């Protein structure tokens, strides 16, 4: 599990337990909603209309975030370099290699070790001394799924809570119901030995009458419900909040209304409240939002090492239609040794058609698309990771963040394009980046119609890489392909 793991061996069991936990929580028609996602499975389990299937399968940021948390089996050993910008450049910059150096409460140390974790991750080494400092320091941090950021801010909240004071002291905003529950599970596990510290969820369906005396010290919720609890129902006194966490900021600003609601909540907080913001990306819109909501922050950025195409051999095959593409795919399968493969389609219709064709020809195939619930997607990815299926056919929902060591081939059954029908360079990079990982060699095949050839040439020029034409009828040529 992504945000639970700090570097121990507890991951696989926790992943399985959380998969089970969420499958009991999420109703088929209550899957993550509102963030660009337009379709979910019908209530009877049937698939949606063909009109929906013709649309590009657009990535749902919140669903992807939850999916990555569910499928992570260990802490990500990030190759990113951590860049720290202090609000006071003259102050000494501290980092830690052990949890003991943080001088935590004994019950917190016990909770950390009971979870099976032993040392801070790379980003935690720099972030935790700032988050636990006295007086409190504000922080804006770029942190991707799997780097231990949820555990870090949960530790900060638990460290500042006074169990004897029975009112909300820490407030955490998450973009969805499911992500709020996920964070709460981390609080419950890490705070296992923190006697009399409790969590409350300000999420849809948790109806609390106006005037109720809320005695739980940590509140986790979505912006709309938290806003209602604070200003309409008067359940939370924001002037008493000591730690304010805004998680998944990039997802927040992608959701209509959430950024304004978050800012309104933040403006009612006391000046001495510690404010922490986390985002997987630092695009201009995210950065502008972060600067509006977090005053005088320290900043932690990940200087990302670019995905490289140097260890991926790229080919293209000219085809007339999708049946042509499928025949070319069969020829490639017949000519080279394949471990596991991921095949990307631009629409659900093509993904479903290809799945049926391959299954009828006896291939072990699984289909992954945005209409599935997050739990269904996590189950499919785990089966693929376990080798129960050798081919994963997917839309853009799987373009990034899913690492399977056995993947040796990526096929673009359709080239990724944007709404202007121009090449989507970033998606292309992340698609073929599913192979050639962990220092291994990989192969990428692009199945394209003749009229799409100019798009492929733009991709080749953009990445300054070589994409060779392959004759799918020349089996001798195919058999000579090496990783």
UniProtKB/Swiss-Prot annotation:
A motif (Q motif) lies at residues 97-125. It is an enzyme of class 3 (hydrolase). It is found in: Cytoplasm; Nucleus. Its EC number is 3.6.4.13. SUPFAM superfamilies: P-loop containing nucleoside triphosphate hydrolases. A motif (DEAD box) lies at residues 247-250. PROSITE patterns: HELICASE_ATP_BIND_1, HELICASE_CTER, Q_MOTIF. GO terms for biological process: mRNA export from nucleus; poly(A)+ mRNA export from nucleus; regulation of translation; spermatid development. SMART domains: DEXDc (SM00487), HELICc (SM00490). Phosphorylated on threonine residues. The phosphorylated form is found in the cytoplasm but not in the nucleus. ATP binds at residues 143-150. Isoform 1 is expressed in germ cells. Isoform 2 is highly expressed in Leydig cells and weakly expressed in the pituitary and hypothalamus. Isoform 3 is weakly expressed only in germ cells. InterPro entries: DEAD/DEAH_box_helicase_dom, Helicase_ATP-bd, Helicase_C-like, P-loop_NTPase, RNA_helicase_DEAD_Q_motif. It catalyses: ATP + H2O = ADP + phosphate + H(+). Residues 311-478 form the Helicase C-terminal domain. Keywords: ATP-binding, Cytoplasm, Developmental protein, Differentiation, Helicase, Hydrolase, mRNA transport, Nucleotide-binding, Nucleus, Phosphoprotein, RNA-binding, Spermatogenesis, Translation regulation, Transport. A motif (Nuclear export signal) lies at residues 61-74. Residues 130-300 form the Helicase ATP-binding domain. Belongs to the DEAD box helicase family. This is ATP-dependent RNA helicase DDX25. It comes from Rattus norvegicus.
